Amino acid sequence: MKNTKYCREDGYSGEMRKMDDKKLKVCLVGLSGGHLTHLYMLKPFWKNKERFWVTFDKEDARSLLQGEKLYPLYFPSNRSIKALIINTWRALKILPKEKPDLIISTGAAGAVSFFWLGKLFGAKTIYIEVFDRIDAPTIAGKLCYPVTDRFIVEWDEMKEVYPKSINLGSIF
């Protein structure tokens, strides 16, 4: 398992630096726990941008994102048609109101509605497949892949799973 690090010392990748050149409104979608931690580690990119977060209304998320604009996802969301419908409805209310230029997600089910609807509203999308997936796709990754502008993986083996992906190495 080869994990090549392509990120620069300042935490920016070349792809994200290109997007940094203009003032962006960013939507960060990730479930609480590891997905949210993964997104938070991109702080060098999002810290000076107008942004809002979409995650579970749980203690770890509230603590980490204290002072941030936060929209709650319906919980539990994995493999639940009910949750997909509720979170799609929430995305339909949030996206036209916030009008993000860019949606970034580290996955899980909550990302699906925001990516598909985000594209309809003109947002660019970046999906980061989670670090612990080395050679097999996640369900959310498979569902978001067709509408993702930049699909980022953290292992060379994942390039076989997602041929159009970019391996930027570990975010950790």
Can you annotate each of these PLM segments?
Residues 123-172:
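Active-site-proximal region of nucleotide-activated glycan assembly enzymes
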Residues 102-121:
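An aromatic- and histidine-rich active-site surface loop
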Residues 30, 48-87, 157, 168-171:
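Conserved nucleotide-sugar phosphate-binding/catalytic loop shared by glycosyltransferases and other
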Residues 79-101, 120:
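An amphipathic, basic-hydrophobic alpha-helix
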Residues 25, 101-102:
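Structural motif
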Residues 2-6, 11-56, 65:
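N-terminal subdomain of nucleotide-sugar transferases
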Residues 32, 107, 154-156:
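Helix N-cap/beta->alpha junction signal
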